[in-house]
Amino acid sequence: MGDIIEGTKPTLDDLWAGDEDQKPQTPPVSPPRSPSFKHEHKSSFPGSTSPPPASPIGEEDLKPRTARASSSTSKVKSRKASPEEFKPVLIDDLPTAWDEAHETFEALEKCVYERKDIGLSKENDEMMVCECVYNRHDPDADPCGPDSDCINRALYIECIAGECRAGKHCHNQQFSKRQYANVDVVLTEKKGYGLRASSTIPANTLIYEYIGEVVAEKTFRKRMQQYADEGIRHFYFMMLQKEEYIDATKKGGIGRFANHSCNPNCEVQKWVVGRRLRMGIFTKRDVIKGEEITFNYNVDRYGHDAQTCYCGEPNCVGTIGGKTQTDIGTMNDLFLDALGITDEVEAMGMKGSKKKKSRQLDEDFVPILRPISAHEVQKVAAAIRQSMENKKMMSRLLQRIQMTDDGAMHRQLMRMHGFSLMYMVLTELADDNEIVLLALESMNKWKLQIRNKIEDSKIEEPVKALSQSGDEKICGLAKQLIEYWSTLELSYKIPRVSKIASLDADDEAGTQTIAEANVVSAARRPDAWENTQEIQIDIAPVRPRTLPVSRPRPPPPPPPLPVKKPALNSMSSTDRLKLDAIIAMAEQTVQAQAAAAAVEATASPQAGSSRSGSRPAEDEERRKRQKRTHMTEEELAEQKERRLRKLIGAVVVKSMNKYKDMMEHDTFKKYARECTDTLVKKEKKRNPSYQDVKHPSLSDDKKAKIKSFTKDYTHKILKHLKEKGKLRNPKSSSSLRTNSNDPRQAASSSTNGDTPSISTTPSQGAIQRLRDGELVDDIFGADEDMVMDLDEDTPEMQNDHPAPPSVPPATPPLPPVHVEVVDNVSTPTSQWET
């Protein structure tokens, strides 16, 4: 990054020149020649006093301009010299600077959000599913890849794992799987740190996600002024969507080090990943090894003043900043292709340079719009999704759709989720009558046979709202569409299991706020910061081991003797122990059978005495049952609330248990109760029918919501304790961690597979569940009534008279054992005969 232009220190008023009631859609950038950093207010701000954009250009207005434009284009093409061969500049001689660059900011593995309700995408669920299928008979198939016909990839929507029909062969999950390119961080001569390709990178490859703190516009403006006051020379703001920005100035990923170029090899793209909108740096062409990774800052990145550009490209405009979204020189290639003006822009040299100013869309360059052709459908659909913050671009794209009469193009647009795109247009830009009118006129030409797409896209909702509009033309078109759609029939399709329904829960669990990240900060650096350089370590000399004394080889064993009936005194100690164990078990079996027979013989005369001996226990149980039978309604309601409280408390304690070592035990119990009480109140308010259920339970979805709420609640507690200095350091090792050298653990495992095992050691998970249950009882108390209710539901408790004492089942007798011992074999073999 270059040095900023010298001038007076900017203030917040200087950064946002204009009326107080103005709310800019994009952050301002000072023009390069303004020493006072004053932003020249233009029509890029909605609600400005400047005249509104011109209405759509009619055919009569385009006639003279069309002729002049075509003639001038032909002249320019005839004068245009043959292009020189492009040779990228390599920076493979620069040293890597991973560690030095890491000291300048705090690394994040993924974006963190000021609130969880920002950074959300506006797409319908219907747009999340593509049509790609993996063909196992085609080894060269690339489902959902860059060269495929994947709808999701064309619209910058990432496929959902488990939902895409290509399965594990899907190539459109770069963000979720963190499939980043192989790059290095280097220190440049004039531009600060930069990124360099460590290997050849193909076109349309994700270099790195642009990671940072996602903040709202109010926070963005405050940070702009704060960074200026702190003397920070380079800002790293990127506009995610309307009134939402990614700030990678102090926290982010290595994508922040990608430098600017007026002829970049990469571009910034906004992708829908699950429920979130995320930004990534993608290659526009093949990038060779040693080439610097660059993209154009003039539209995608924002700062408070312009800076000198050091890209060194032939078409360098000289400065970074001061450009608008309608500047042809910085316009994304996607929009040029979608407007169908790429060839015209290149032929007339409209992108500008240091000596020539670039053209402005609809100001000094009015494009000649034509109907959409087949190869442009995907570009137009993708450009519409990317133009929700650019009304002027959206108007031009909708004009192309409106003037297209080819039914085949209409079907292709509907296949590219055209109705869902129009739903976004009518909901996000409903205040612009020109755009709304163009959208309605376009959809009025789309012919359907069934209304499934209408239902899936939910387009009927905004159209019904427009049917009540005060504009007669908009109202008439909306009613006409609703009437036409009502004549269509809905086709039934067999529904398949979808994972889209779980996206909300996954997003809630996987999204972290800035406050949570500040409390639970990762101590280690992400994998991208691992130092791959060779490190030499001096190891202390180790005393050589003494060689074992060579011993003579034993003589060969004698020939085997004939098998004889084993004598008891010739058996080894292991054989004797095994035989003793078998004999003891057989004796136990005989004794158990004899005891069972004796009990059966004496059951009748002793029945009365056994009942009289257990009379106190029976009286106590009968007293508890009578007490519950005569409970008042208030007592029953209190009992059910206590059960619900303990049921929710068990999930809360389990979720908070990982932070138990960071606070005192009494403090942990206090906040666990408070969190549980809050959730119980919410559950009682939302689901009053819990009182009708005798044994309440929680669904998996509700447990997930409780865990998410508990996680946020615990993070706030930890932050509060940290501010008061009461936060304890977590223990270095868990008390439940198993020591592999523990002799007790070794003793619990059997040394011989043939020896019967008498007892087993409970697993670590069982111990943890037992301890969690004890902790829940310690916090909320044991519920004896619940245990008694469960006992009543069993068949034994349904009778008024208790059952006689049960006798343990007799152990089945063991089959006779015949042991054969061979003298020349060290381990005897036991043969079980039935």
Swiss-Prot record:
- Relay the domain remarks: The AWS and SET domains are necessary for transcription repression.
What organism is this sequence from?
Cryptococcus neoformans var. neoformans serotype D (strain JEC21 / ATCC MYA-565)
- Give the catalysed reaction(s), semicolon-separated: L-lysyl(36)-[histone H3] + 3 S-adenosyl-L-methionine = N(6),N(6),N(6)-trimethyl-L-lysyl(36)-[histone H3] + 3 S-adenosyl-L-homocysteine + 3 H(+)
Q: Which GO terms describe its biological process?
A: methylation; regulation of DNA-templated transcription
Please give the InterPro entries that the UniProt record associates with this protein. AWS_dom (IPR006560), Post-SET_dom (IPR003616), Set2_fungi (IPR025788), SET2_Histone-Lys_MeTrsfase (IPR050777), SET_dom (IPR001214), SET_dom_sf (IPR046341), SETD2/Set2_SET (IPR044437), SRI (IPR013257)
Provide the residue span(s) of the region labelled Disordered: 1-83, 531-568, 601-638, 680-703, 720-818
Protein purpose = Histone methyltransferase that trimethylates histone H3 'Lys-36' forming H3K36me3. Involved in transcription elongation as well as in transcription repression.
Q: Where is the composition biased (Basic and acidic residues)?
A: 692-703
Q: List the Pfam families hit by this protein, alphabetically.
A: AWS, Med26, SET, SRI
Name of the protein this chain belongs to: Histone-lysine N-methyltransferase, H3 lysine-36 specific
**What is the similarity comment for this entry?**
Belongs to the class V-like SAM-binding methyltransferase superfamily. Histone-lysine methyltransferase family. SET2 subfamily.
The Post-SET domain is annotated at 305-321
User: Gene3D superfamilies of this UniProt entry?
Assistant: SET domain, Set2, Rpb1 interacting domain
Question: Composition bias, kind Low complexity: at what positions?
Answer: 541-550
